[in-house]
């Protein structure tokens, strides 16, 4: 029995580590890919179902539902049920599952997948809640069906908690470790708070884009975006609230800016977008879309309050006939940004000076 328990824990922990290690080796970026997590946890569930825990030669406990808890938490109902279907099918064909057992397994996965993504607690606590839900379902089935016995469920309770606690702590700790490694390796390029490029990467990219625009006879545009009254957010609410606002503004910018262009956080509450081969009209329209999008959005603070914000945007633009230089386009955009601030904020300004 103890050998089987140790095997189940070891396989789960090893699978979690392998998931993070392979993903980091592949792209040097730590992100939760639902497909990647599904493949991992499906394989772990199959390995666990191959070595169930025997209890005094009377009961056999399958812990293959534990990886499904992770899918319920980190993916959605579709991936959770898909994984359970694969595990159930394989065990019906070459394992010890009956069709009824497989169907019960899939139903539990559906319930877990429907609840897991909406739990507000921490990851570790959420996984324990999902484990309790699964155990309650097993307990109910032991009372109303012949497929489970209540004694079997009583043995399952402590073993499942040992496995879920161990594996969830491992999952979160390894995630944090590789995230810190990734942050360290990319600190010269990436703004950790927003995930956008930082000011060093902005300078490099603007210089390179200016050079290529000059060589290819393309126009060069630069948007400097500043959050109006951001200091008041920090002073009235907290710096934590200010950080939350910066992250939400960064996400909003990603939604509006075409994928071929890069977005940067220059520091503080200022963002920048480098554009090329765009007309002045296109640059202004993009700026106005961003300004209007921020104005119409609501921003959620950690204390559950909701606030409204606005941005001022300065547009720097060099035509195909202008000499493209990093310093020149930045100065134009910076001057226009200050003009927008002086004109009452929540403005888009560009040269020739026109206020929208």
Curated annotation (Swiss-Prot):
The chain crosses the membrane at residues 2-22, 36-56, 77-97, 99-119, 124-144, 154-174. Its main location: membrane. The keyword Cell cycle does not apply. InterPro entries: Diguanylate_Cyclase, GGDEF_dom, Nucleotide_cyclase, Rev_trsase/Diguanyl_cyclase, Sig_transdc_His_kinase_LytS_TM. PROSITE patterns: GGDEF. NCBIfam families: GGDEF. This is Uncharacterized membrane protein SSP1970. It comes from Staphylococcus saprophyticus subsp. saprophyticus (strain ATCC 15305 / DSM 20229 / NCIMB 8711 / NCTC 7292 / S-41). The lineage of its organism: Bacteria, Bacillati, Bacillota, Bacilli, Bacillales.
